[in-house]
């Protein structure tokens, strides 16, 4: 259970190919059989001082756990993870894509805390199901965008991916105000067997797109963006996400995972409202966090908040 592309050896190898990440992998076995696996990366931002205060370990998707994993096996896996990463990262965050409710007490016993966090799972078993579940406003936005000349397709070359990256970079600098992966990530993902990058064209320019990863039966939307306001009837962000959803439905994937939609009490979170209209199921599988260095964690959290206000 709880398996996803981010907990595979292929993902670990991909992380290992990136110069700006420090990958890690831990396993617990019963005999020769793996019963649990944690794959993730340590990320740092900026210069030496900022890197020191921004060291965090990210586990995308949450641990891979078999149906019959025991409490002792999971406890052993979590303890090995925290022991090995102590001193390397300030905190560890598991961003769950599946339901870990029955394991929550074990996580908490090992020093992890649970934080509510939303996500959307879209049923892409068929294009008919996708179309039936789309909200009326999304259908209208897609229809008018295509009618007035916008198109979407898989990126044909790295030059197109670079144009998309420039839009993402501007978005993260001005609105998201958190660090974006460097160009190396997008270049290598595009050239990998798992990456699918779609771009939106309008009036001869790339005006948006989405960056996806394809797992066994799920397409994951890692990044998405669009230059809104370029036309009253063209909606690049909507077309970008729909491109990934349509690809999933037409190529045998049963789910499109939006990889996060904010948390309760975040003031409405416009991105969640945007994602909701694609007709997916709102799930709350949350995140587990283990703070390895409380003092540095609180200093880092305060500093990030102040920097966002100053930008």
Regions found by a protein language model. Name each.
Residues 91-94, 153, 257-259:
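Short catalytic-loop micro-motif centered on adjacent basic/acidic residues
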């Amino acid at each position: 259970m709880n398996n996803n592309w981010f907990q595979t050896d292929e993902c670990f190898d991909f992380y290992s190919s990136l110069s700006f990440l420090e990958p890690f992998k831990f396993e617990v076995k019963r005999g020769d059989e793996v019963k649990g696996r944690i794959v993730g990366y340590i990320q740092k931002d900026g210069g030496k001082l900022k890197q020191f205060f921004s060291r965090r370990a990210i586990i995308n998707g949450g641990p891979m756990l078999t149906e019959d994993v025991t409490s002792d096996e999971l406890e052993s896996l979590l303890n090995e993870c925290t022991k090995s990463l102590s001193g390397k990262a300030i905190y560890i965050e598991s961003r769950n894509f599946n339901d870990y409710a029955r394991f929550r007490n074990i996580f908490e016993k090992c020093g992890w805390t649970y934080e509510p966090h939303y996500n959307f799972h879209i049923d892409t078993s068929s294009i008919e199901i996708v179309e039936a579940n789309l909200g009326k406003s999304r259908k209208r936005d897609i229809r008018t965008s295509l009618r007035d000349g916008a198109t979407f397709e898989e990126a044909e070359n790295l030059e197109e991916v670079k144009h998309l990256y420039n839009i993402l970079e501007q978005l993260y600098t001005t609105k998201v105000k958190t660090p974006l992966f460097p160009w190396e990530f997008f270049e290598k993902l595009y050239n990998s067997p798992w990456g699918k990058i779609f771009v939106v064209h309008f009036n001869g320019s790339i005006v948006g797109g989405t960056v996806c990863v394809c797992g066994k039966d799920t397409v994951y939307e890692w990044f998405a963006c669009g230059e809104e306001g370029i036309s009253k009837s063209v909606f690049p962000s909507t077309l970008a996400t729909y491109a990934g959803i349509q690809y999933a439905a037409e190529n045998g994937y049963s789910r499109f995972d939006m990889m996060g939609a904010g948390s309760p009490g975040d003031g409405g979170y416009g991105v969640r409202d945007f994602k909701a209209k694609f007709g997916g199921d709102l799930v709350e599988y949350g995140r587990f966090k283990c703070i390895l260095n409380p003092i540095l964690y609180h200093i880092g959290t305060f500093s990030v908040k102040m920097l966002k206000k100053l930008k």
